[in-house]
From Swiss-Prot:
Protein's name in the database: Carboxypeptidase S1 homolog A
Disulfide pattern: 50-121, 325-361, 332-354
Keyword Nucleotide-binding on entry: no
Organism lineage: Eukaryota, Fungi, Dikarya, Ascomycota, Pezizomycotina
Species annotation: Trichophyton verrucosum (strain HKI 0517)
Alphabetically ordered keywords of this record: Carboxypeptidase, Cell membrane, Disulfide bond, Glycoprotein, GPI-anchor, Hydrolase, Lipoprotein, Membrane, Protease, Signal, Virulence
Gene name of the record: SCPA
Amino acid sequence: MRLAASIAVALPVIGAASAQGFPPPVTGVTVVKSKYDENVKITYKENDICETTEGVRSFTGHVHLPPDNDYFGVYQNYSINTFFWFFEAREDPKNAPLSIWLNGGPGSSSMIGLFQENGPCWINDDSKSTTNNSFSWNNRVNMLYIDQPNQVGFSYDELTNITYSTINDTISVADFSSGVPAQNLSTLVGTGSSQKPWATANNTVNAARSIWHFAQVWFQEFPEHKPNNNKISIWTESYGGRYGPSFASYFQEQNEKIKNHTITKEGEMHILNLDTLGVINGCIDLMFQAESYAEFPYNNTYGITAYTKEKRDAIIRDIHRPDGCFDKLAKCREAAKEGDPHFYSNNATVNAICAEANSDCDKYLMEPFQEANLGYYDIAHPLQDPFPPPFFKGFLSQSSVLSDMGSPVNFSHYSQAVGKSFHGVGDYARPDVRGFTGDIAYLLESGVKVALVYGDRDYICNWLGGEQVSLGLNYTGTEAFRKAGYADVKVNSSYVGGLVRQHGNFSFTRVFEAGHEVPGYQPETSLKIFERIMFNKDIATGELDIAQKQDYGTTGTESTFQVKNEIPPSPEPTCYLLSADGTCTPEQLNAIENGTAVVENYIIKSPAASKGNPPPTTTSSPTASPTAGSAMLKAPVAMLAISALTVLAFYL
């Protein structure tokens, strides 16, 4: 084994994105005990790890909820220690609104959004230093990044010794009573969560119940946030297409119960004044979005053809056949309505029916796309995709960073326990009580702004499906929204960043030249859209006050499909040790496993990878690469024993 001098041989790296050895002892944290419950507390630490703007404060910490409670309406017998990272606004934080940011998964850390998309800093390719992000979303808004549900990212239930395989991207519980095992590039050690699938929320609605309790504690008792503006927004991404509508509608329902005195328990009566729900490339409802998985790989604005028209037509037929995807989704939803109406996922029969529906839909929707060897999150990129750069994983591996954060656990970008728990009950196949599109309609009727924002190169939660969701809502503004045309999103005097359909508080935006993580591709465009929505301006120009003009509607074309895009150059390949399964070739994976890889700052320098083939178009043939594809897919699928759709679709 050869390691570059920049990585100490004695300090391994850990986690599905994680840390150099065990975390250092936690010191210097402030402890705030709840005035409502002696068993609840907040621990936190102020630091300048990412936000280095003079005078702008940031804090990392945990909200600790004890076991033996019925927070979810079902007995919860595990500790919940939910991690947060709070950044004050760079401009007038006392009067700035606040937005929560949640990545999806289920099981993905919100550090993905913070460091790859919209946080105050970018991580440089040395995985050690940072560069200021001038398009950070905390320019004018207080930002609260949360790792949820329990066991995601820096959140944990109980501190547990673990090993991590960089080859398979898997975490295993370890017994170190006889000593810590030898470590190398492929096998690392650290401290994580218990990895018990039952020690976390097991579905979207239970996650909503959990995050509401977190919010009750944080917004009432975190002493460093005392704003004059008490409005709260939720922005989210990917599987957040389910999180966002469910969480926001649950918050709104709880607000109503507090107002009518249905909720009277001390410490749980803080009204969370919802302002905006923003969803970026959200997978919201498979009933609305399923056909887009067949259509988008063949028919998109880049001229990329992952497969033929005949294959597309066959997929459509398969999902509509008797006892196919749509039939099984309908059966799942009917069973859930009868057997688990409040979405606790405690009915084994319902869980099995919905898990089968999820698996069947995957078979016909996802598997044909795998053969094209294209990026799930960017169809113009190869399957082994180095963008957005994964350097934050090495950054969060540093002992000094973990110490400054006050974290007792190593970082992991994805929780296997959460993935297993959600997928085992068929979460993606079923809606919540109102339905996720119904949740959006409910929020709009309640006066909450809702923005759907989609990058136009993402396959996994693509904009064609997102547009169908936007047109399928049933609320009082439905017809007016559908009649609104698409207008240019004017980012600056020389650049149009996308097209938006907007009526009043509801909008759908297609962002040009962006994959799944839109702010990582188009930071200026994303910031403009975010701030215009947050401050009640029209998305197209940012000049009109929507609060004073609630009947505002965009004018323009009925469709955006006439606006075509050029295929960008493929990114230079970068095999990154802490993202090996998604960025490295089979040859590089073998070198990591046998210890012959040359590594510098987590980047495999040798063996080097060659640039992949350009994506197939209408004038070329698909270039399938089953070997490379299997290198990406084998670990998560084998590890979770679940469908490729549920593993890959929502890693972010």
